[in-house]
A protein has these predicted regions:
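Short beta-strand and adjacent tight-turn residues that come in two discontinuous sequence segments
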Residues: 1, 15-21, 94, 111-113, ...
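Short beta-strand-to-loop elements that line the ligand-binding cleft
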Residues: 1-2, 21-22, 67, 86-98
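Short beta-strand-centered segments that line the small-molecule binding cleft or hinge
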Residues: 2-39, 52, 128-129
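Alpha-helix/helix-capping structural signal
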Residues: 4, 46, 71, 97, ...
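Short beta-strand elements of ligand-binding domains
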Residues: 17-22, 43-45, 66-68
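Beta-alpha-beta core module
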Residues: 26-33, 37, 51, 98-147
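A late-sequence structural motif
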Residues: 49, 73, 129-171
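Secondary-structure junction motif
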Residues: 62-84, 114, 151-160, 169-176
Length: 182
């Protein structure tokens, strides 16, 4: 479900809450940051640009494979979506795993979120590189609820579940210490 549809469903009472990339401000909806994850470069073995660490200026759009919307960074100076307007490799649907296979077969590189790193094989993990710069190479994930929502216990159950599989260093400090307070 796209973020705007999710927010509409929250406002209409069709769903209680939703999780999406932060920055989807809407009147009547509260946003609670949950965790922040970094992005990494995933390179094909044949990629000529095997730098140990990447800077945004090293990421040329010609060889980049991106998904239609999933890798966009809202309000960022370094947007993976800029390549879309240049007519390069834009993968229309699927998953990060499929995108990695496309890179492995066709060359080039893509951007993958930190939460996907544990799913890589040892060989694939060798093709991952860091991107320098905190703001430019990360995204914040938030929980969205209607502003009059009162089920604090349910929200804390969601937060507690996330704490079990999201590394503590990625979780928001307030969520870790205090949980969600309405």
């Amino acid at each position: 479900m796209k973020a705007d549809h999710m927010l509409e469903a929250i406002l209409n009472g069709e769903i209680n809450a939703g999780i999406a990339i932060s920055g989807n401000a809407r009147q009547g909806v509260l946003e609670m940051p949950l965790y922040t994850e970094r992005f990494y470069v995933y390179l094909a073995e044949s990629c000529w640009r095997k730098l140990p660490v990447f800077k945004p200026e090293n990421l040329e759009h010609e060889n980049m494979w991106i998904m239609k919307e999933a890798q966009c960074l809202r309000d960022s100076a370094f947007s993976f979506c800029k390549a879309r307007g240049k007519g390069h490799h834009v993968y229309e649907a699927g998953s990060i795993e499929t995108l990695i296979r496309i890179v492995d077969e066709n060359g080039g590189y893509t951007i993958i979120p930190e939460m996907h790193l544990p799913f890589l094989t040892e060989k694939q993990a060798g093709n991952v590189r860091e991107i320098q710069g905190d703001y430019l190479s990360q995204r914040r994930i938030s929980l969205y609820i209607k502003d009059d929502y009162i089920r604090q216990r349910m929200l804390n159950t969601v937060a507690d579940t996330l704490k079990r599989f999201v590394p503590a260093r990625m979780m928001g400090e307030g969520i870790v210490k205090y949980g969600i307070k309405l």
